[in-house]
């Protein structure tokens, strides 16, 4: 049964390579398949963390001089020299690995350490989305220590349905961009991402198996879809977008019901991060995919939850 499931996923993601031209979903499925019989305990998270630290330090050094990038500043697109936001995405992955490693021993000193390093990385990279995401993650973990907070239905269902909420927000904000002034203000804060979402929704139809989309800046005409949810919907297609939301919702509900609140905080943080980045399908950058793999194997093998906090 499990083999048939992954075989279908592999065939489906191979089809997506031809229909949309992106390989992220395929390699993520390969990673999930490789997780068979691998117990993602603290030891494995520790190994992943320290290997990641080495590569992150090397990446920071190689990117020390920055590179030319196009950014939306004061209502217009401008060229500027800055360090890549991918560095912050990679740092976020390291933070998640660290939190998963110490999920049972996550004291205030370790959390304070995360906050301090987060600020230092922000000074080096300058990604507002990244620094806010880590702060949100830390705040969520601290709030989840309260039984009363965890038992609030609005919190539980807000977390469980966060992927769907973020998907709906991305679509509605893109469609209604020209109708509401507050969306234009929010667009400037998000460096033109909502305007780009609006442009892509106008330019492309939604297809079941996705399509190739143009991204580039030829003749000063800048096109860049920097939203994971619209990238799934437009590029990977309606089937994939629905599948992602359904599985993500089920996963967060499972973690919440089993009191695995560090994992819930990580999953919700990534769900929100996807509003302004497209790396959710990248198994090298999205560490929550380890949790997807764990959940799928538990469901198919009908084994008990290995960790209850």
Where are the regions that the model predicts?
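Hydrophobic transmembrane helix bundles of membrane-integrated enzymes that assemble
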Residues: 1-181, 202, 220-307
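Alpha-helical transmembrane signal-anchor/signal-peptide segments
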Residues: 182-186
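TM-adjacent membrane-interface loops and short helices in multi-pass inner/ER membrane proteins
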Residues: 194-222, 238-240
């Amino acid at each position: 049964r499990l083999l048939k499931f992954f075989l279908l996923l592999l065939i489906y993601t191979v089809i997506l390579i031809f229909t949309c031209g992106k390989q992220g979903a395929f390699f993520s499925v390969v990673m999930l398949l490789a997780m068979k019989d691998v117990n993602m305990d603290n030891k494995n998270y520790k190994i992943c963390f320290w290997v990641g630290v080495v590569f992150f330090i090397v990446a920071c050094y190689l990117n020390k001089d920055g590179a030319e990038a196009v950014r939306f500043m004061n209502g217009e697109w401008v060229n500027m020299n800055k360090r890549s936001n991918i560095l912050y995405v990679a740092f976020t992955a390291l933070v998640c690995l660290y939190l998963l490693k110490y999920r049972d021993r996550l004291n205030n000193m370790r959390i304070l350490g995360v906050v301090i390093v987060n600020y230092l990385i922000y000074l080096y990279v300058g990604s507002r989305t990244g620094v806010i995401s880590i702060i949100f993650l830390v705040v969520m973990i601290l709030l989840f220590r309260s039984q009363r907070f965890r038992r609030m239905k609005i919190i539980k269902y807000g977390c469980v349905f966060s992927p769907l909420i973020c998907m709906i927000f991305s679509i509605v904000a893109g469609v209604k961009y020209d109708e509401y002034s507050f969306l234009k203000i929010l667009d400037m804060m998000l460096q033109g991402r909502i305007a780009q979402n609006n442009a892509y929704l106008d330019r492309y139809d939604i297809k079941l198996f996705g399509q190739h989309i143009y991204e580039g800046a030829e003749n000063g005409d800048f096109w860049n879809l920097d939203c994971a949810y619209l990238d799934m919907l437009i590029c990977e297609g309606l089937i994939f977008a629905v599948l992602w939301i359904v599985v993500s919702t089920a996963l967060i509900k499972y973690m919440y019901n089993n009191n695995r609140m560090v994992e819930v905080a990580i999953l919700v943080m990534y769900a929100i991060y996807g509003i302004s980045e497209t790396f959710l399908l990248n198994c090298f950058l999205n560490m929550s995919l380890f949790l997807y793999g764990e959940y799928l194997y538990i469901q198919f093998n009908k084994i008990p939850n290995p960790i209850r906090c």
